[in-house]
Amino acid sequence: MKKQGYKVAVDAVDSVGGVVIPVLLERMGVEVVKLYCEPTGNFSHNPEPVPENLTEICKVVKESGADLGVIVDPDVDRLALVCETGELFGEEYTLVSVADYVLSNTPGNTVSNLSSSRALRDVTEKHGMQHNASAVGEVNVTTLMKATNAVIGGEGNGGVIYPELHYGRDALVGVALFLTHLAKKGCKVSELKKEYPSYFISKNKIELTPDINVDEVLVKMKEKYASEKVTDIDGVKIDFPTEWVHLRKSNTEPIIRIYSESKDEESANALAHKIVGEIKEICRL
């Protein structure tokens, strides 16, 4: 790893990741550029590693000439990555890329939750293995991983679970595996990203009135799409040939969350818009 001469910029949002991530990288022979790595407990920005909170690290990566940007959340279980161009790698693709590396060395199955990208399934099948989807939640993912002897799994929000070490989301594991993958491929991060299927996930919600029975709405949507592949272990997920939509009710308010994935943003949003319209029709809104 040291001979690669990697430079990695780290945004640890001034939490514990600011201690452990730089140490890991330095021991791997990587030069570290630190951004918000003082564990003061006072988060320097919104700690959720989503695009709107990552503009600064993207700028630092580009201006410092770093090969990679690493962002972790306060408890270091979610990992987001930035390409050398300053563009986001995509939180869904953290797990996809790490799984690609693990499967190239260790044949086995993979698991992610129902709301995670289809890209993991594609990469798993490329290696001749089987992908399975669990209900949302780390405990559900790990339970299914154990049941199917999965060698890698996680959630599309940047959570990597590598059973060879332990059954829990771990950004440290993600960083080590991703950098090893990158070094063995001998390419830039932006080039690696282009190797994976391109999908876009749109996240929406529809607010209903308290008198509406959300469970009944989900049953009707399931019946409406009975000719498609429908999964109902966690809300209702409808798999179409080239896209999918996942409907989940909130446990605290009359809301249905709508996750849709397609080949690009426009198509994913169009699918979500169509589903919202159908739900409104069912509810007579």
What are these model-derived regions, one by one?
Residues 1-185, 192:
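Phosphate-binding chemistry for phosphorylated carbohydrates and sugar-nucleotides
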Residues 68, 106-285:
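Phosphate-binding and adjacent anionic-ligand microenvironments
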